[in-house]
Amino acid sequence: MFRLLHTADWHIGKSLAGYDRTGEWEVFFQRLIKTIEEQSPDLMIVAGDVFDSATPSNVSANMYYNLIETLHTKYPTLKIVITSGNHDSQSYLNAPKEILHYFNVDVVGSVARDDDGICFDKMVIDLGGAIVCAVPYLRRGDVMSMGGEKPSVSEFYQRMLEAAVKVRGERQVPIIGVGHLTTIGAIYNKDINSEITATRDDSVGGLENIDPHEFPDDFAYIALGHIHRRQRAGNRENIWYSGSPIPMSFSEKDYSNSLSIMDFDGRQLSEIHTVELPHVVKLRRVPDKLSDFETVANALQQLPDDEEMFIEVALNPDLRSPEIKTRIINELLKGKKAKFCGFQLVGVAGASILGDDAPMSVEQLQTMDPMTVIADIYQARMHTQLSDRHADMLRTIIDEIAET
C-alpha cells in the first residue's frame, strides 16, 4: 500500500482585515505534524498557493522552512512534492529547490523547459512507490508553447502521463497528477480577495474551466489546488480538491477544512478519508443577515467576552459611517476579544443590497472594498473575471492611493 497526504492553498502570510494570522498557521502546522505521525503517509503533496504573496515576509518564509526541517527530522522517509499556485512566485519557490531536495522535498515552481521546448519528463518525479506528475500553475504561455492546432490543458496532462508511463515501466505503482486550476462545476466563492484571482481563458483549452472528464483516465489520482472548499471534481472519484487548511475570508467561514488521505493498492486508488481541521479562530457574521443598528448592537453585546473571533458586521449599507464604525469598536466591542473586520461585503453589479433593482448610492459604494467593486463590475460587463496580472496591478494602485 502507498499512502498520500494531499493538501493545498496554505496562503501563508495572508492577513484578514489587517490582522495577523500567524498563530493559525502555527496551529495548522502542529496538526499537520500530528496527522503525519498518526497516518504515516509515504508522500505529502502541496498543490499550490503555499504563500499568499509573491514576496513572502521573513516570518512567512521562516514558518515554511522550519516546517520542512521539522518534517525531515521527525520523518526522514517522508517524501514531499510542492508545486506553485497563482499566488506564488515561481522563482521564489524554485530558488532553494536543489537544497530542499536533500530534505526529500521536490519543488516544481514553473514548467520545465530547454532550448527545444517543454521538458515533460523533468516534471515527472519517481518516488519508487509512486510516480508524480508535478504540474505547477499553468499560464497561457505554458500551454501555447506545446504547439499543435489546439493546445489545451488536457493535452498538457496527456503528455505528462505519457512521460510518467515511460518512467514507471512494468512496475505496479500509481501515477499521481497535481494541478492548480478550476474545473467545470467546482463550487467556490467569487470573492476577489479570497480564492479565485486567475484568468479564465477559453481560447487555450480553458485555462480555468477544465472539464474533469478531459483528464486522462490512467491517472490513479489527481491532487488539485486553487479551490478552497474540499470537493470532488465533477463525478470523478479520483480527482479532488483538498481545500485550504483555514478559512481565508468570511465567504469561507462555513467551509469544513481538512487534510485528505489517499491509499493506493498497486496502480489504483483504493480508499479516501479526511482528517478534519477545526477552525482555530472562528469567523462570524453578526448578525447573520443585514439588519438595522439596534439589531446589530444587541447581537454584538451578546458576544462572549473571552472568545477570540473575527467578526463581520451585517449592518444595512445606508446606516454605515465612520462614526458608526468607531462606536462599534470603542463601545459595543469594548472588553471583548472579538476583532472587527469590517462590514459585510455586498454585490454591486445589477442588484441592490436589499435585492431590488435600484442602483447603489455613492455612500454605499464608499463602505465597500474597492477591489471587490472593480472585480464585480468587470465580471458583469465582460462576463469573465479579472486576470491575475490586472488584479495585481489594481491592488498595487489601490495600495499606493491608500498610503498617500
Question: Can you say where each PLM-predicted feature lies in the sequence?
Answer:
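N-terminal active-site segment of His-dependent metallophosphoesterases
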Residues: 1-69, 76-77, 177, 396-404
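Divalent metal-coordination and catalytic microenvironments
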Residues: 9, 49, 64, 85, ...
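His/Asp/Glu-rich metal-coordinating catalytic cores
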Residues: 56, 87-236
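Catalytic-core regions built around general acid/base machinery
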Residues: 63-75, 207-218
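A short helix->loop->beta-strand "cap" motif at the edges of active sites that frequently abuts
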Residues: 73-79, 173, 237
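A conserved active-site cap/scaffold subdomain adjacent to cofactor or substrate pockets
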Residues: 212-216, 220-285, 289
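Accessory, non-catalytic peripheral segments of nucleic-acid enzymes
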Residues: 264-404
